[in-house]
Amino acid sequence: MLFLHDFHVSHTTLHYNKSEESIEITVRVAIDDLEKTLQTKTSGKLNLGIQKENKLSEKYIKNYFNSHLQISLNEKKVTYKWIGKEIAKDLHDIYLFFEISDCHSDGKIESIKIENTLFLERSDKQSNIVLIEFGVQNYNINFTKDYIKESIIL
């Protein structure tokens, strides 16, 4: 007998690149979760990773993430730029790449605040795991429908 279970998770890594003075953001999520979420906000299927991919898929992804993954450095909201995407070898997940460049032009980064509501409108059971790698300091945070904001003092 087969039991189906509804489990949705995203994995996000924020890695501080000291030499570039940037924060590299990598998100891994199930293609199906991303497509179904964006399909409710757009017209038509995205068809990610196949030849018939919607030409506006990157725009839709960028807009969605800008609204649902907000990052502040030293209490100042920052914008991040789209780098690209890659389908995982298992063809189940997709990697999304973003970057915050010149992230401490105002001086030392003392705090990071994250508001993460990714895919929460799709499932109450959504779990958004975030790993922050900042030099020798690492932080793991699990965002859920009941826990969407966290501030880290570095």
Question: What is the predicted role of each segment?
Answer:
Residues 5-154:
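N-terminal soluble domains immediately following signal/targeting peptides that reside
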